[in-house]
Design a protein with these regions (language model features):
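N-terminal secretory signal peptides
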Residues: 1-14, 18-23
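Catalytic loop of the DD-peptidase/beta-lactamase superfamily, centered on the K-T-G motif
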Residues: 28-69, 151, 157-160, 195, ...
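Active-site helix/loop module of the DD-peptidase/beta-lactamase fold
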Residues: 37, 53, 83, 88-92, ...
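Active/ligand-binding-proximal structured segments within catalytic/core domains
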Residues: 97
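A generic structural signal for nonpolar/aromatic side chains embedded in well-ordered alpha-helices
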Residues: 139-140, 174-175, 182-184, 289, ...
């Protein structure tokens, strides 16, 4: 992923969406008028910022209760968004990566406070604090002291296709002294590992590489076998190649006031943000996250492990839009209430997940448009409605 999910394009969207259509599948709450009310609410919110396509889902007690698609997956062909449309979910990928790492903890392959360096095939240490090891917990919580300063300067993406550079080679180019992009000043902060929050894509790339080495096979294959298959996530893919064209949500950005498609891109740090998934699939995944690790009759994490992921901390440097950082999951205010959450953003996509652990419920929202301040507000409005005291489709 090249852009942080916190980045916002200030250009206001002027694209007028005509004939926004809602398509529905899966389980729904309540009577038809209630469903129509939710449809009308979401369509109104979309029109505020001219979002071409959106998918939303609600999970409760380990079940995806409500999933629905709105608008267009592809504007030119007027192909509608369905609940099986596969969106690039960007940094929501990190929640899946974190979940797989926690499975390795449960399997006793690693411990959270183990140093990661012994599991690597290259040396890893912050040169300013060489005696302080970087641990799995540090990476999961964005307190590893690994900096993204150089990461954002060098574009490793490949347009229209999956990246060919292996993730290990990519990481060494940034983290191994003497390699292409590695300088001690740019690739590591002056802070000691474990002390200061700084969002790190490189840290999550490292987690994907570590999980592959420790788990005995590519982490992507581990997630297919241990997470996606048990949860029946049939429309989720780590690659562009494995995302059927008929199911792809075309990403869009505004250029000179006109909606323009953005080419799909592949990048070598796949564990950071390469996942494509449908709202039906991902709502099933977050159903498990909100329900103590269990959904669809399958357990992907023990309840104590899932609860541990949602324990929030406030390290130095935590930005004011967050109220806490957990293991993969973050926390922020939604309508004045602190909720576990994560956002994802890349050119042409903006995604979000919010959770209410007390009610074992969660909301998912995917869009195929670059983020703006206005679309951020829309996503929050929809998530708030989904997690509110009334269920989707009511009021």
């Amino acid at each position: 992923m090249r852009t942080s999910e916190w980045d916002v394009n200030p250009q206001r969207r002027k694209f007028l969406i005509a004939g926004l259509a809602a398509t529905a599948a899966g389980a729904c709450f309540g009577r038809a008028p209630q469903i129509e009310s939710m449809d009308s609410f979401i369509l109104r919110e979309m029109k505020k910022t001219n979002i071409p396509g959106l998918a939303a889902g609600f999970a409760e007690n380990g079940v995806a209760r409500w999933v629905r698609g709105y608008g267009f997956a592809d504007v030119q062909t007027r192909r509608p968004v369905s609940t099986d449309t596969m969106f690039h979910i960007a940094s929501l990928t990190k929640i899946v990566t974190a979940t797989m790492v926690m499975r390795l903890v449960e399997q006793q392959r690693i411990r959270l406070d183990d140093p990661v360096a012994p599991h690597l095939d290259f040396a890893l240490a912050n040169p300013s604090h060489a005696d302080v090891p970087i641990t799995f917990r540090h990476l999961l919580m964005h307190v590893s002291s690994i900096s993204d300063e150089e990461y954002y300067k060098h574009d490793s993406r490949q347009s229209g296709t999956d990246a060919t550079q292996p993730i290990g080679d990519f990481l060494k180019s940034f983290l191994l002294p003497g390699q292409q992009y590695c300088t001690s000043r740019a690739c590591f902060s002056s802070e000691s590992p474990g002390t200061t929050w700084s969002y790190s894509n490189l840290g999550y790339a490292l987690l994907g590489y570590l999980a592959s080495r420790i788990g005995g096979e590519d982490m992507r294959e581990q997630t297919r076998k241990q997470i996606f298959a048990p949860l029946r996530m049939r429309h989720t893919s780590w690659t562009i190649r494995d995302t059927p064209e008929a199911l792809r949500a075309t990403p869009y950005d505004m250029v000179d006031g006109k909606l323009q498609p953005v080419p799909s891109v592949g990048f070598p740090d796949w564990s950071v943000g390469m996942l494509r998934s449908s709202v039906a699939d991902f709502t099933q995944f977050v159903a498990a996250c909100a329900n103590g690790g269990s959904a669809a009759g399958h357990r992907i994490l023990d309840e104590t492990t899932q609860r541990q992921m949602l324990e929030m901390h406030t390290p130095k440097g935590l930005p004011d839009w967050l109220t806490g950082q957990g293991l993969g999951w973050m926390a922020a205010k939604l309508d004045g209430i602190t909720r576990p959450e994560h956002w994802g953003g890349d050119p042409g996509v903006f995604t979000a997940v919010y959770m209410n652990p007390e009610k074992r419920s969660a909301a998912v929202v995917f869009t195929n448009a670059s983020v703006t301040p206005e679309s951020k507000a829309v996503i929050k409005n929809i998530a708030s409605r989904l997690l509110g005291s009334t269920k989707p489709g009511s009021g």
